[in-house]
Amino acid sequence: MLSDFFNNLASFFSNIFSLFEGKKQTRILMIGLDGAGKSTLLYKLKLGDIVSTVPTIGFNVETIEYKNLSMTVWDVGGQYKIRALWKHYYHGTNAIIFVVDSTDRERMDEVKEEIDTLLIQEELKGIQILIFANKQDMNNAMNTSEIVDSLNLNSIKDRKWYVQPCSAIKSPHGIYEGFDWVANSLNNK
């Protein structure tokens, strides 16, 4: 498949570049439902600023140098019809970042279904999951414990997981803390 070819080619060049930079190469899959703020969060970390985004049809890919890691982050669209394509991005993934719109209580069952689907994928077996509870700056945002309960995350026993509250628009602090968790858990593998 053409997407596999490009994924393998990107991985090859990332590995070549890492030999010169001395940074550990990692592949991060950033997914979540549409409108959760994935692209905004990615570009806030990459550029340090808010950029105007449109719904992602397909994917965005960026390399982020963070601590001792060179992270290739694949931000894949979250519209319902696109989610069936997520499986094409699983190969070689070292960590998953699932971005949740903390204000969208009505879609938490849908989020849970998607996370449950990820957990049973053989290619993602044991892969850690960071859940960014985005849009914490909004008055009606669910807090971390509400997200954990709503998604039944305490039942996950076969991998590391962590929920990090953040606001991609208001403050980078939660974003950095989340990526710290990813970096630390990848380095301690």
UniProtKB/Swiss-Prot annotation:
Species, as recorded: Dictyostelium discoideum (Social amoeba)
The gene coding this protein: arrH
Residues that hold GTP according to the record: 34-40, 75-79, 134-137
Protein name from the UniProt record: ADP-ribosylation factor H
Function: GTP-binding protein that may be involved in protein trafficking. May modulate vesicle budding and uncoating within the Golgi apparatus.
GO MF term set: GTP binding; GTPase activity
GO biological process: intracellular protein transport; vesicle-mediated transport
Family per record: Belongs to the small GTPase superfamily. Arf family.
Compartments in which it is found: Golgi apparatus
Domain of life: Eukaryota
Keyword Protein transport: yes
One cellular component term from this protein's GO annotations in UniProt: cytoplasm
Keywords: ER-Golgi transport, Golgi apparatus, GTP-binding, Nucleotide-binding, Protein transport, Transport
